[in-house]
């Protein structure tokens, strides 16, 4: 870090995270972004463990392998046919999703789901028992597609969604749930099937699926595919996406770099309705397939992240192969994807007295492309040399979700000037009372987390204490 005051003597005594130089009363520190990938809730790279086909792309990984060397992986995505999850009515094969899910959960990552109703690589995405009960379907080139308006199909869909919501809704380990039981591959389109059987569905049908999912998922983020209104229509606003937005449902663009430029994507304009309020999710084409057809372009992948203000981006291939071929652009994307909360400067007193107010002034900036939707509050934690917590000072006047989003190198930080008191005393007719608080010289750390001081968001600094707190320097507490 750089010292704000050019004092070589002070710099020599500086700690590893910051190079503060004391005035007679305060220290000012400018933390330096270490450039590393961050693993934080609701952002980063998504590893596709199942991409419809169960072998793609987690089947080559050992049971303990979470591909930790791929920087910025925060989520594992499980997209698979309904027929594999509920092969018999009401009898669920939870093992198929919970086994890989727990591998990443215990590594501190999140999970995301898409259960599909129609597939063209296997006989059917929908379980046979649904059709045996009388749900109408169409046969297309050997596979089955349900009539998405059929009341028997819709009832079975709702029972499945209800069962999944009971298990997963509101779990902080779940990043999002895709509305996948309408359309091919869970992508909300029938472009491959309607020309064959002649049946098409529109807004009224699509709305039913949004309503079913939002009825049961009250807390977890839901998304629809950008293909709901048409896979290659470049308009920004559609009736179905406006409706989804009104219900708190975001979009997932499933078609990045499927075709070469200028058709590398179609719906960046659509994303502008969503990203200010909820995360936008991107899926690039299967990496190998994109390369084979000449559509893969590293710079365009970064541009898509910028244009869509994307929070999450797929690893849609064998993860280590994609990493080796794209390490340079992955590192650059990691500096921008989602949110990247930076404290640009902080000034705090060298010495404070118990039961006496003081101020900490800090400048904060989000240097990612998307808001920190879950939010969080800055916290200053004072610890002794053994790591014991002496004081916790939360700045609830600044929520990082309110920090603006700017182009690289643009915009200005937000300043927060907050008054704190350590070991405040209260006096009444019975006497004066205050919590026990030691005096002496301590370390002061910064973090971002919940309103009572638990860190939840990784910051781009060295000097982590193991709990997402980052050392700024020292502070003395006196009587």
Give the role of each language-model region.
Residues 100-111, 136-178, 202-212, 216:
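An active-site-proximal structural segment forming one wall of the substrate-binding cleft
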Residues 1-4:
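Positively charged n-region of N-terminal signal peptides that target proteins for export
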Residues 54, 85-86, 119-126, 183-189, ...:
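Short catalytic/ligand-binding loop motif for oxyanion handling, primarily in non-cytosolic enzymes
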Residues 334-479:
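Extracellular/luminal regions of secreted and cell-surface proteins that mediate adhesion/ECM remodeling
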Residues 181-211, 216-276:
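Substrate-binding cleft/loops of secretory-pathway carbohydrate-active enzymes
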Residues 17-28:
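Bacterial Sec-dependent signal peptides at the C-terminal "C-region" and cleavage site
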Residues 7-18:
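Bacterial N-terminal signal peptides
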Residues 26-152, 272-325:
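N-terminal substrate-binding region of glycoside hydrolase catalytic domains
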